[in-house]
Structures are given as structure tokens and as C-alpha cells.
Design a protein with these regions (language model features):
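Donor nucleotide-activated moiety binding/catalytic core segment of transferases
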Residues: 262
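Helicase motor interdomain insertion/brace
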Residues: 1-241, 245-259
Length: 262
């Protein structure tokens, strides 16, 4: 079932949003891309991996580039799932960008002696004392080894793009959520006109737990008041819920109650 995103038609067209997403550099996820030329070999020796018995090299910088492509696709999947999930993700990305920009502005290389990435042990890379002087999660890069001007420029560009997306997405409240409204209409039609006598069961599958939680929070009470039916939320994260009092949150209990035959 195809659905628009915004009942008010104020959210940008999907093509426009997709173009904006494709413009994102997501620089924070590719720190090796911004390592200075005179330092690239040091990082290659630390992070690149030999493959095929030494016949080839799996470059970490290529892995980061692939990750960025996957993240762009994931953003579109999040938007396809629900505007709520999409808003959470782009807001998180925006916060990460702002945090990195603050770290760059606060960076002072004079506070510490020059470091060499090859001489640092893994345990040192996780040190809280060094955290302010580097970025990255699994792949650590020292700020002193980066082209911070170019890195900051790409982060600032991402901040502009992400800010515009977040502002538009936050405007699509549950009251304006076209997909949520269509789902309610579909559920109501199924309950009021069941294919089989007295079969009012409706199962909604989603790939993302936060979408499931969002749907439950806006459908459960409505379904009870408008349709006289109970609802349950089942996720893999242990956040199960149901409108049936006294049932608890045990997965098997909920499934048995809502579908005793199966």
C-alpha cells in the first residue's frame, strides 16, 4: 500500500529528500578520508588488512566509503518505515555532527606531545585521557593527523542539510502522519468487514522496533475506543506491551492469548 508522508503536504517530495541525503558526506564515518597525506601510510599500516593470502589488501578507507553508502540507504529505509523512525535517525546524525564540530573547535594540539598512531596500543586508544584528541569508534584517528579545515567544511555542510531535514521531519506529527492514518483506515476496514466471520485479528510487521513502539502508542488506545479491540506490542528488545490487563509482557503469554489456535 503506497502512502504519502504528510497529510498537510508540507514535507518535501521524496525525490527532493533523496537528493539531500545523497549530498550528505557523513564525514564523521570516514575519518581516514581526511588524514593528511604525510600520515596516510601510518594509518594504512595500522588498519588495512591483507586478504587472499597476502595477494590483496582490504583498505579501511574503502570500507568506510561502503559504510556511508549503506547509511544513505538505511536513511531511506527508515523513512519508508515511519516518519518517526526517520526523524530519530536524522536527529541523531545531526547531534553527532554538532558534537564533532565542537570537538574540533575545542581541540588544542599544544595540550599534548605529538603522538604516533602506530605507537599507540589498543588500550591507549580507548583511554579517556586521549579521547578529546581523536575521533572514530573502532577506527581511531588523531585530530592532529587530520586535514581539519576540509573535515570541518564537510561537517558544516552536513549540518545544514541535516538541519533542514530534521526541521521538516519534526513538523510531521502523528496528527499529520499520512501513513499512520492510512494504517488506521486499513485496520478499521478489516475489523468492520472481516474476510472470515469474527476474525478481527490484524498483524502489523515492521523491521524497526521504534516504529513498532510508535505505532502501538498511537493505535492501541484508538483501536480500543473506536473498534473495541485489544492490541499488543512485541519486539525483540523486551519492550512488549498489551492493553489486556493482568497479562504481563511475556512473549508466549501474549502470543497464546491473541492467537490460541496457532
Amino acid at each position: 500500500i503506497y502512502s504519502d508522508i504528510d497529510l498537510s503536504n508540507e514535507f518535501p517530495p521524496l525525490k527532493e529528500v533523496n537528493k539531500t541525503i545523497r549530498k550528505l558526506s557523513l564525514a564523521g564515518y570516514s575519518p581516514l578520508k581526511f588524514v593528511r597525506i604525510d600520515k596516510k601510510e601510518e594509518y594504512a599500516r595500522r588498519y588495512d588488512k591483507a586478504v587472499g593470502g597476502g595477494k590483496g589488501v582490504f583498505r579501511q578507507v574503502d570500507r568506510e566509503e561502503s559504510l556511508i553508502h549503506l547509511m544513505r540507504v538505511n536513511l531511506l529505509k527508515r523513512m519508508e518505515s515511519s516518519i518517526h523512525s526517520f526523524t530519530l535517525t536524522v536527529s541523531k546524525l545531526l547531534n553527532q555532527v554538532e558534537s564533532l564540530l565542537s570537538k574540533i573547535d575545542d581541540h588544542d594540539s599544544d595540550l599534548i606531545d605529538a603522538l604516533n598512531i602506530e605507537e599507540l596500543q589498543d588500550i591507549e586508544l580507548e583511554s579517556t585521557e586521549l579521547e578529546q584528541f581523536m575521533i572514530g569508534n573502532k577506527t581511531k584517528v588523531l585530530l592532529q593527523d587530520m586535514d581539519l579545515i576540509r573535515f570541518k567544511q564537510e561537517l558544516e555542510a552536513d549540518k545544514i542539510f541535516l538541519s533542514s531535514i530534521v526541521e521538516a521531519a519534526k513538523g510531521v506529527t502523528a496528527q499529520r502522519d499520512a501513513k499512520l492514518e492510512l494504517l488506521k483506515q486499513t485496520i478499521a476496514a478489516k475489523v468492520r468487514n472481516p474476510l472470515n466471520p469474527d476474525n478481527k485479528k490484524v498483524i502489523v510487521f515492521t523491521a524497526f522496533a521504534d516504529t513498532a513502539q510508535y505505532l502501538y502508542s498511537h493505535i492501541a488506545q484508538w483501536a480500543s475506543l473506536e473498534l473495541g479491540i485489544h492490541s499488543a506490542l512485541i519486539t525483540g528488545g523486551g519492550t512488549n506491551k498489551t492493553t489486556l490487563s493482568g497479562l504481563g509482557i511475556d512473549l508466549n503469554n501474549i502470543l497464546t492469548t491473541f492467537s490460541p489456535v496457532s
